Amino acid sequence: MADGLNRVHYNPSTAQLVEFALLRGEGELTANGALVAKTGTRTGRSPGDRFIVKEPSSAADIEWGPVNQAFEPGAFEGLWARVEAFLADKELFVSDLEVGADPEHYQPVRVTTQYAWHQLFARNLFIIPEEFNRQDKPVWEIINAPDFVCVPERDGTNSDAAVILNFAERKVLLAGLKYAGEMKKSMFSVQNFLLPAQGVLPMHCSANVGKDGDTTLFFGLSGTGKTTLSADPKRFLIGDDEHGWAPGGVFNIEGGCYAKCIDLSQKNEPVIWDAIRFGTVLENVVMDEHRVPNYKDSSLTENTRAAYPLEHIAQRKEDNRGAEPHAVVFLTCDVSGVLPPVSILSKEQAAYHFLSGYTAKVGSTEIGSTSAIQSTFSTCFGAPFFPRPAGVYAELLMKRIESFGSQVYLVNTGWTGGPHGIGKRFDIPTTRAIVDAIVSGELKNVETVHLDTLNLAVPVAVPGVDTNLLNPVNTWSDKALYAEYAQKLAEAFTKNFAKYQVSDAIRNAGPKA
């Protein structure tokens, strides 16, 4: 990006970016010191507008389809040039950042944004290195031009906006989008493509570590509890959303957190509550007349967010890294009310449930999602972000679990006693008690009961949890109806899993329809 007539601010500080954002009318300051910005009509990710350039160096390794849509190299060149021309006379913000808190597996990235608040977001979510690009790797480039309007007939896009990844040229283009989450997820997709070739499993999970150095991972889609459960006052946070698992340890891909704010309370989520202060970006959060954020207000979107650097969390692992995990938790939000609150999985069951990624779209991060809650299967608990075929990630997971001996658990943060609308959702204290028992190792060799239809082993007792909750059939007043719903869920699993080419051992580890 030429530094000609336009003013370019290199590596600006938090205070400078907040000032610029306020002066330029990009946002407002809240009573707690955070910067609130609104993202217009797109208040979540736009999966229909995400593309990967189809070029010889990467084409054979990508699972092309509705998630990874192909974009022509020539069309990309033209669009990139038009966006550069559009930004040529604009004031711009540029930072040299990194993705991946690991000396071997990081990627250097130069982020250029039209908006000051987007630059603040990038500096909060990516890693600000002490010394940029120590290994002198080729640098990735992100350009974010939210005011550029794409023209599908001219640009080859599907709408007025696009997110395009180009692996050959190490470029990410964001045009016509104000929702900042697209920036972080685009670099996550980049690492999800690059890391497996280095023998590293990229994961859509949160991670924390205990005083004794024991690491726990929490996999799950948006709204299932990854951020809430990993922000544990008794443990040290590694990160809340994106990690790599290499032989020998786990590392955060990011340098910050992107926490959901809907119904946020100091009582239930003290770590997140305290992290929202000066330097934090609040996305689409509504304020009252005294500028106090009203976290209950979903009038703009259910998907309200807080973006803050890990430095805002007192109890964190300062190097953003941890040992290999003793415990791995798959968080699922079961809207049918059928799954138990906790199950203990074999490694084959772990691969089955990892590939299935069964959960619900709760406060979905995708545009057009309303509060209607529906069940979904999202491969690897993050289908929208994984460019390679699912089997690549499942095999890496099995390999890591086997070589380290990690124990995997399936934890339901959804409903019990009936489906959504009839049953009730497990409360956070119940799930926390289950997680406490998992991380302390109390569930490692316990007595279990086998649920035949679901093909799951359920502990008969968990410290601090009402025993009646553990076997889901006990929470339903109509036992026949429970059996019917369990059968329906087993059939949904089997139907979804038919597309995977896996060993019989893995296929037979799922529910029995």
Curated annotation (Swiss-Prot):
Q: What class of enzyme is it?
A: lyase
Query: Needs which cofactor?
Result: Mn(2+)
What are the annotated GO cellular component locations? cytosol
* Reactions catalysed: oxaloacetate + ATP = phosphoenolpyruvate + ADP + CO2
UniProt binding sites for substrate: R45, Y179, K185, R305
Q: Which InterPro entries match?
A: PEP_carboxykinase_ATP, PEP_carboxykinase_C, PEP_carboxykinase_N, PEPCK_ATP_CS
Q: Which family does it belong to?
A: Belongs to the phosphoenolpyruvate carboxykinase (ATP) family.
Q: How does it assemble?
A: Monomer.
Xref: HAMAP family: PEPCK_ATP
The name under which this protein is listed is: Phosphoenolpyruvate carboxykinase (ATP)
Q: What is the lineage of its organism?
A: Bacteria, Pseudomonadati, Pseudomonadota, Gammaproteobacteria, Alteromonadales
Q: Which gene encodes it?
A: pckA
